[in-house]
Structures are given as structure tokens and as C-alpha cells.
From Swiss-Prot:
Subcellular location: Cytoplasm
Organism: Caldicellulosiruptor bescii (strain ATCC BAA-1888 / DSM 6725 / KCTC 15123 / Z-1320) (Anaerocellum thermophilum)
Role summary: Associates with the EF-Tu.GDP complex and induces the exchange of GDP to GTP. It remains bound to the aminoacyl-tRNA.EF-Tu.GTP complex up to the GTP hydrolysis stage on the ribosome.
Segment forming the signal sequence: none
Keywords of the record: Cytoplasm, Elongation factor, Protein biosynthesis
Protein name: Elongation factor Ts
């Protein structure tokens, strides 16, 4: 039997509507973990529909790390000013700024990586595989696998979240879209590191 307390607990854990929580619990036979999974699956579908909506509101979040050693600015957009003031949205923006400071991505998504950069990386990875003595017929598969690791390093959305490495940033974003109920877009960011690109004068 599904109780009101179970529905309330599931709602608190997921942010989903009461009726959605009740239906998920019924479909899961009262299993809380399974109900959460069902809501996430259904939430992902909702998030995909919301992704086509225009997100022109939002905030520019800043984060300074390590006694002024690293600074980040990130613009995150949503659909309404109401959500831009929402505490959960603002915390999400802080988490993303901290992620950028810690993981040093170069691009928001893999779609932003220039084709010439991808081709250059493929050439390097192919040569590495050949130098390791890998058979020619499996080199392309090895290159594709290592290219995925490259995207995980340089693309913010592909990176494992520093607070929960089992989840990628794109999964966190999708979860927030489903929970908050609006399209959310990580538009752009800038990361500064003290002394970056400056050659220190050699001491005499």
C-alpha cells in the first residue's frame, strides 16, 4: 500500500509533483529506489522537451579559489527571472563555477570543439596506438575510445561532477531542468589562473 508519507518522502527526494510520485511508487510496487529511477527516467523525457525553449534570463556567477589563485565567471541561462532568483538554480550555478575552477574545461560541450582540434587529437592518439604496437585493424576503435576520454577532459558537460563522480555535468544539468521545470543552458565561461601564460624571469 502506498502511504501519504511515502509520497511525501519521494517528493522531497526528487522535487517531482505529488501525483507523479504516487504513480511512480505504484509502478515500482512501493520500492523507493525504483520509484526514484522511474521519476528520473520520466524527468529526463520532460527535460528533453524543455530543451527547445528559449532561455534568456539567468545569472553570471563568479567563484574565486585558492586565495585569489583561480577565478571563474560563468553565464547560466533559464527561462524566467523567477527561476534566476531560485536558491536551487543559484546553487547549481555555484557548483558549475566550482567545477570549472577545479577541472579546467576548455569548452562547454563537445559541439564547441573545433574540427581541427579533434583531427589533431585523433592523429596524436592514432600515432600513440601504433607506437604501442597495437594492430592496425583495432587502432581506429582504440582512437575512438581515447577520444571520448579527451572530450571528458576538455568539455564541461562531459566531465564527471567533482561532488559526485558517478554523474556527469550533463546529467546534473538534465536533472536540474526536470526538477526546476525550465530549460537551463550553460552558455559560456571564462577561467583565469594567476600567472597563466606568463614566463617567470629566471632567477640569477
Amino acid at each position: 500500500m502506498i502511504t501519504a508519507e511515502m509520497v511525501k518522502e519521494l517528493r522531497e527526494k526528487t522535487g517531482a509533483g505529488m501525483m507523479d510520485c504516487k504513480k511512480a511508487l505504484e509502478d515500482a510496487g512501493g520500492d523507493m529506489d525504483k520509484a526514484i529511477e522511474l521519476l528520473r527516467e520520466r524527468g529526463l523525457a520532460k527535460a528533453a522537451k524543455k530543451a527547445s525553449r528559449v532561455a534568456a534570463e539567468g545569472i553570471v556567477e563568479s567563484y574565486i579559489h585558492g586565495n585569489g589563485r583561480i577565478g571563474v565567471l560563468v553565464e547560466i541561462n533559464c527561462e524566467t527571472d523567477f527561476v534566476a532568483r531560485n536558491e536551487e538554480f543559484r546553487q547549481f550555478a555555484k557548483d558549475i563555477a566550482m567545477q570549472i575552477a577545479a577541472a579546467n574545461p576548455k569548452y562547454v560541450s563537445r559541439e564547441e570543439v573545433p574540427l581541427d582540434v579533434i583531427e589533431k587529437e585523433k592523429t596524436i592518439l592514432r600515432q600513440q596506438a601504433l607506437n604501442e604496437g597495437k594492430p592496425e585493424n583495432v587502432v581506429d576503435r582504440i582512437v575512438e575510445g581515447r577520444l571520448e576520454k579527451f572530450f571528458e577532459e576538455v568539455c564541461l558537460l562531459e566531465q564527471p561532477w567533482i561532488k559526485n563522480p558517478d554523474m556527469k555535468i550533463k546529467d546534473l544539468l538534465t536533472e536540474k531542468i526536470a526538477k526546476i521545470g525550465e530549460n537551463i543552458v550553460i552558455r559560456r565561461f571564462a577561467r583565469f589562473e594567476r600567472g597563466e601564460g606568463i614566463e617567470k624571469a629566471a632567477s640569477c
